């Protein structure tokens, strides 16, 4: 039986395709050093799980011999292939990965692990990984040590999926993997009030909201960033987690 939470999760998970081009333009990329740490030398054949528009795929391609993006949303796959000539995105999900057993050196997941059915996904990820292969979820998170960023998060936290961005901190990846290691990387992007509105408009809670709610959220964002001037730095922390297949 499907619960309301599961229905909400599925609706949000598949909402991004309608804004694929905007997502591609405004979501931050990942520091190369964060990806290199996540791979830990397992860089021959890397699978980007829940690849979206290919933000992480591009960075993986800079440090790995072969990258295989996997994405369930056709709109996101089309955008990925448009921005990464020669790369073919495979249709699939964390619960049904289109790869043979023991053929992948590393599986990375950028901004995606919180959408997975973890029990099923852990088994599938372990199936496709070679012995000793690495699984590494990654998140770009706004740096809430900065006061205005914390205020922004406080304003919209209740609209995100429960546990979003925090559910790996004390987790394991099941009996098929060893202990989870973690590391963080600080970085920032230069943006504007319009850029912040565009960033919020790519969030699942905005994409699935009604028009009145969207207008209210947009006004709130503009109010929060108005004191920051025409351009300002949006600070991020990239959180990386990795564990090795036993």
Regions found by a protein language model. Give the residues of each.
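A short acidic, Gly/Pro-enriched loop at the edge of an enzyme's catalytic core
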Residues: 95-106
């Amino acid at each position: 039986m499907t619960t309301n939470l599961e229905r909400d999760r599925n609706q949000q998970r598949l909402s991004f395709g309608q804004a694929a081009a905007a997502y591609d333009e405004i979501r931050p990329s990942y520091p190369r050093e964060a990806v290199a740490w996540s791979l830990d030398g397992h860089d021959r054949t890397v699978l980007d799980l829940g690849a979206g528009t290919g933000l992480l795929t591009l960075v993986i391609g800079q440090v790995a011999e072969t990258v295989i993006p996997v994405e369930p949303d056709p709109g996101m796959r089309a955008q990925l292939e448009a921005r990464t000539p020669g790369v073919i995105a495979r249709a699939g999900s964390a619960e049904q990965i289109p790869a043979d057993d023991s053929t992948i050196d590393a599986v990375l997941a950028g901004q995606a692990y919180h959408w997975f059915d973890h029990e099923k996904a852990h088994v599938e990820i372990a199936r496709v990984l070679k012995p000793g292969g690495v699984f590494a979820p990654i998140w770009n998170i706004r740096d809430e040590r900065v006061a205005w960023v914390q205020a922004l998060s406080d304003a919209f936290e209740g609209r995100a999926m429960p546990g979003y961005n925090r559910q790996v901190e004390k987790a394991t990846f099941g009996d098929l993997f060893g202990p989870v290691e973690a590391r963080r990387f600080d970085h920032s992007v230069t943006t504007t009030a319009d850029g912040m509105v565009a960033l919020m408009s790519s969030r699942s809670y905005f994409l699935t909201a009604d028009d009145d709610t969207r207008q209210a959220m947009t006004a709130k964002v503009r109010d929060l960033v108005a004191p920051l001037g025409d351009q300002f730095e949006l600070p991020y922390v990239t959180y990386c987690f990795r564990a090795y297949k036993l």
